[in-house]
Amino acid sequence: MITVIGIFSGASVVAFLVYASFYIGSGVYVKTVSRLPTDKKILALTFDDGPHHEITPLILDVLKKYHVEAVFFCPGENIEKNTLLTRRIMNEGHLIGNHTNRHSALFPFYSSKRMKTEIDDSWNRIVSAGLPDSSRLFRPPFGITNPTLRKALRNSGYTVIGWNIRSLDTIIKDPVVVVRRVTRRIRPGSIILFHDFNYYAAEIIERVIIYALKRGYVFVRLDKYLGIRN
């Protein structure tokens, strides 16, 4: 009996640790903003892993059409490769957030020192691209957090941004299914995660925006709503 209890207890601990690391909204290891603290019909759009030289301009056109501001979490290397496009993002009222320099799949396994270097290198590329007004918003690759990341972010001044609606647009290939998945989950204060490198991304964004606006929702830029300054 003791052995069985021990097994179940051990399994529970493992399950909790996995939940704490892989669900960015848990806040166990790193304090995050994964939902806006409001009951009003307010939403925030975020985009990861861009900018993409073909897809991101289409998304920007849609956002401009509906006067929606968003946050783009871009790896530093992508910023360096697409400096003019990154400047367009900023010039049209959006914000560039830190998403590490290389967005490595191994990032969660780095030492805290190496994590900090990745984060700092990304910020330096943001500044080098002439984007000094970028706020200190950070989103870890894949949304994975752990004690090492907490140490790397200590005294960094970053606000860590998560999400409570994950579009799964990198997995689901049918835009209709993605739109349905997102719109069914929209609630006051939702932070929505998209990626700006899928060929149907602009179509999805427009449908979601139209759905939300028809129901009285307003889109806000995270740093402005939260009162976060550089």
Predicted regions span which residues?
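N-terminal membrane-anchoring alpha-helices
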Residues: 1-34
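His/Asp/Glu-enriched short active-site or ligand-binding loop at hydrolase and phosphoryl-transfer sites
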Residues: 144-146, 150-185, 217-228
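Catalytic grooves of carbohydrate-active enzymes
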Residues: 186-224
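CE4/NodB-like, metal-dependent polysaccharide N-deacetylase domain
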Residues: 60-73, 94-95, 112-144, 151, ...
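Active-site beta->alpha N-cap acidic-glycine motif
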Residues: 21-110, 121, 125, 134-135, ...
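Non-membrane alpha-helical structural segments and their capping/turn regions in soluble enzymes
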Residues: 112-117, 176, 199-202
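A cross-domain feature marking catalytic cores of carbohydrate-active enzymes
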Residues: 47, 74-76, 98-100, 140-142, ...
